């Protein structure tokens, strides 16, 4: 249980980084976190999920600018979600699969709320993950059924979009 909580805290914090950096076309790995206003590098001990936000009253320790509450919400939601998954599935392949998928969905949702765009990479990651999970878990008939149930509507949307020369649904 403690491991699921810690994994959720770390994942929630990293999800916040992804939500900030992907819309700005920045690397999600380097450089380390910094303040938007004063550009001070955030030391590891000031970057502890949830606790740092609370101890610093949701502000940069140097310049006092408020840190977006959405990052704090992510840092709370993700470990709660991981604990629910842990109590439902234990540390199993299903736990890790669902934790990954839900983390991607949370990330896409928060980016969508901020920018009104869901980058294509999230659809690709979810499709690939779902396919791999299906291959490892299900029988071949389900692979084709899954591919057809996703592929046919997407093919129809792209075809209709080409036919009327207008984007029907945003694909990022």
Model-predicted segments: where are they?
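Membrane-proximal soluble regions of multi-pass membrane proteins
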Residues: 15-71
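Functional transmembrane core segments of multi-pass inner-membrane proteins
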Residues: 95, 100-172
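Long, highly hydrophobic alpha-helical transmembrane signal-anchor segments
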Residues: 1-23
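Hydrophobic alpha-helical transmembrane segments and immediately flanking/interface helices
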Residues: 69-78, 95-98, 167
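Transmembrane helix-loop-helix
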Residues: 86-97
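Hydrophobic, membrane-inserted alpha-helices
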Residues: 55-58, 77-85, 103-106, 126-132
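Hydrophobic, lipid-facing residues on alpha-helical transmembrane segments of integral membrane proteins
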Residues: 6, 10, 14, 76-84, ...
């Amino acid at each position: 249980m403690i491991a699921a909580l810690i994994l959720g805290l770390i994942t929630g914090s990293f999800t916040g980084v992804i939500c900030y950096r992907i819309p700005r076309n920045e690397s999600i790995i380097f450089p380390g976190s910094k303040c938007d206003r004063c550009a001070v590098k955030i030391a590891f001990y000031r970057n502890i999920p949830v606790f740092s936000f609370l101890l610093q009253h949701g502000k940069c320790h140097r310049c006092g600018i408020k840190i977006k509450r959405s990052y704090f919400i992510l840092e709370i939601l993700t470990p709660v979600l991981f604990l629910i998954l842990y109590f439902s599935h234990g540390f199993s392949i299903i736990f890790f699969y669902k934790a990954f998928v839900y983390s991607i969905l949370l990330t896409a949702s928060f980016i969508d709320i901020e920018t009104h765009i869901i980058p294509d990479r999230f659809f690709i990651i979810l499709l690939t993950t779902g396919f791999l999970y299906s291959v490892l878990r299900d029988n071949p008939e389900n692979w084709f059924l899954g591919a057809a149930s996703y592929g046919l509507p997407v093919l129809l949307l792209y075809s209709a979009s080409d036919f009327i020369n207008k984007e029907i649904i945003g694909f990022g």
